[in-house]
Design a protein with these regions (language model features):
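A long, amphipathic alpha-helix that forms part
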Residues: 36-65
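Context-gated lysine
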Residues: 10-12, 26, 45, 163
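A solvent-exposed, charged loop/short amphipathic helix patch at secondary-structure junctions
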Residues: 15-43
Length: 179
């Protein structure tokens, strides 16, 4: 059996704070502390979603220590950010070697650095869409690709431009061989 968990964690766009947003389309805030509070709430929402995913992974592994698990989707966080790290459960973060079998591995590490991005914002490629797998799936892993060839910058200039109807995220595709 293969467990597939899809995620779409809260974006980094600040959460609405009543009375603080002047123009929600342009992201104009009345005060800096209103923007900071909205950003804080967004990060808390994203982290609480990541925590629930990690709890689900741990429950699956508690029931079946050999479970094959894939967690994939829009994490709205880069590899070194806490939501991704929390879902991975790295031994370096928990300081508990007994949890090594529960670590999830990001498959994007096999993709060259210059091609390792799924989102383009203000001229910078960012890896915010991930596919994480349990270690027992690595023996079946054959490779992955990120199809970011036609990815446009999602800055405000492109956000409302109807000439760019496709997603602002590139798909991550992985191949596994279970024969």
């Amino acid at each position: 059996m293969l467990h597939v968990i899809t995620v779409h964690l809260k974006s980094k766009i600040p959460s609405d704070i009543p009375g603080q947003v002047i123009d929600p389309v342009k992201g104009i805030w009345r005060t800096a502390d209103g923007w900071a509070e909205g950003s804080f709430l967004s990060s808390m929402k994203r982290m609480s979603q990541a925590l629930e995913v990690r709890r689900l992974i741990d429950q699956i592994l508690e029931d079946d220590p050999d479970a094959r698990i894939v967690v994939a989707g829009d994490f709205n966080a880069e590899p070194e950010e806490v939501p991704v790290l929390a879902i991975c459960g790295n031994v370096e973060d928990t300081n508990n070697g007994a949890l090594a079998a529960r670590v999830l591995v990001p498959i994007e590490h096999s993709i060259p650095n210059e091609a390792r991005y799924t989102h383009f914002h203000h001229g910078r490629g960012r890896m915010i869409d991930h596919m994480l797998v349990t270690r027992n799936l690595l023996a079946h892993y054959r490779g992955s690709e990120i199809h970011n060839e036609i990815l446009h910058d999602d800055s405000l200039a492109f956000a409302t431009d109807t000439k760019y109807p496709e997603s602002d995220h590139a798909p991550v595709v992985a191949t596994f061989d279970f024969d």
